[in-house]
Amino acid sequence: MVKLDIGECKQTTTGVVGCIQYIDHFGNLVSNIPASYVQGKTWYVQADGLSIPSCETYSDVKVGEVVALVGSHGWVEIAINSGNAHSKLQLDWQETLQVILT
């Protein structure tokens, strides 16, 4: 197995900049930003000109809505409730995203 270096996320004055580290089999875009940066805070994600609101669970939003949340592996991810974020948003591995703390 070859391990690819995607770099580490970096704190900014408004939040954290990271990238998509992998795309899971559901099409969720999993970032390299750990949950510890957003837990207990109000936040959203900016990626490719989109502002994506955060939520706690998929049931917090309607089917088909784009959301940012902490996934089961402890990373911030972009997902679509009952959908495929990778296909719909056309974002790919290593693309930059930013968590904005509000």
Regions found by a protein language model. Give the residues of each.
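Anionic-ligand-binding alpha/beta catalytic cores of soluble enzymes and soluble regulatory domains
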Residues: M1-N32, Y37
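A residue-level signal for beta-strand positions that form part of recognition/binding surfaces
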Residues: V17, V66, T96
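A conserved acidic, glycine/proline-rich C-terminal tail/linker
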Residues: V30-Q90
